[in-house]
Amino acid sequence: MKNRVKELRNFIKSKNADAILINSADDFLSEYNILPLNSRYKVTGFSGSMGDCIVTSDNVYQIADGRYHEQADKEVDHNVVTVLKMQQGSSPIEEILNVLDKNSTLILTANKVPMQFCQTLEKKAAKKKIKISYILNDPIEDLAQNKYTNVKVVEIPKSITKYSAEEKFKKLKLKDNEVLLITNPVDFAYFTNLRNFDFPYSAAPRAKAIVTNNEFEIFTDSKIPLKFDGLKIHKLSTFRKHLANIREKSILVDKGALSQADFMQIHSSNKLKSSKIFELKSQKYNTEIVHLKSAFARTDKVLKKMYDLINSNKQLSEYDLYCAIIKYFEEEGAVSQSFKPIIASGTNSSIIHYSVASDKKMIKDGDMIMIDCGGYFEGGIATDITRTFVKGNPNDECKRIYTKVLKAFISTYTKKYSPDTTWQDIDLNTRKNLTDEDKNGYLFNHSTGHGIGISVHEFPPRCSFQDAFAKPFKKNYVFSIEPGLYKAGTAGVRLENAVYVKSVKPNFEIEVLSHYPFEERLIDRSLLTKSEQKFLDEWQDYGKKNNLCN
């Protein structure tokens, strides 16, 4: 790691700059990038799914949001790396600018950062007289490796997607002066009904597209199993050349998924507008909801098998449980995991996104075990669920915290909402049930929920307390409700259930997709109201009827 930092400092000096931002993303801006291709991981050793780092002449700064504070502290070498712990409401841009001096120059790798991020950064940096400089190639990436060839791409049937790719193309009805630009692999997967499961924790083919009213041009190095009038397929390497040739058009694009490198190829005669594909894919078709109900039912069965294994007499490590959960998903028909399973026992359960299940950390009597998992089944839409289990008999503190988190979920799920309910409302209702634990050292330092779709973290919606997320729900949005409490070095509890918006008007209704029972041994029923006990009894009875309980 020290050699990489030294090389980067020499690179910065050669560019007459003062710092460089090293990213965790790949050149498709994917959320989950495997560690061998994760440049940020190679520099700091931090394995979280998000969080870039800044290398300067005298320091290395690792940005970590609330999910990763404890994990980053454990993984980085503090003799080399300083962890910048973002607080809720702050942004990575603020953290970046805070560590840079006035009149300094920051290098960004243009194909690893979104255009929208760069525009905001440039505006805020200008106030501090900080210059932003762009390079096209990541200085520490192995460019010799072609990452996107020889992968299998499959088409999801209309019984799940409702419309074929050709039908979606025809329904677009673009104007003569409009071009739809698709740079986000998840948007591409949605629009084409194509999936690729060769990359870990992803179902989206690595491809981009340029669409007009009579042509659908795909840019990829994968074999595409589609054929219809107007479809053309090109090598991925030619995408920017085609993009640069577009003139005097209204380009519809998801600006948050357009890399700065792609943006730099767009001629100034064009006008950029929002494509809204990200909103379309969030409103699931009824056929997709039917599939998700089936996929979550199978995910529930995986957790039942995990419960049985934990409560067997076997000596088990976290890694044993990690291997088991992958096996159980395969047994239930999953083609892959939608994210790396989190198996966190004992004090590790306080690490919100604990990433490395240990073969040395044995499960002991009284340990709580937090399991956060999900899979991709035949429909290529993610599942996501979290349960906290216990081995043997828990102490009173574990029961109190678990019950507190359970009460927060019940409150949010059963509340009568108005038709104008926002994403922010969901978070605020959940959060008000947990903040009084701050005084005891237990923190709820992540958002209440996220959208779920082809990617396990889909936007929209995002259920956060920030005013930017005071936006209305739409019918058939799928999202998580996942209250949690975590005390560093002690324990953590998270209970995550996926729901979908059954209706917005005249009444706002949500319905659960995951039905796995809660851990009775961790519930202090004396802390529940009568209505909460009634809800819990009905929930647990459903589990018994569906063979999810012992």
Where are the model-predicted features located?
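Active-site neighborhoods and metal-handling regions in enzymes and metal-associated proteins
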Residues: 1-550
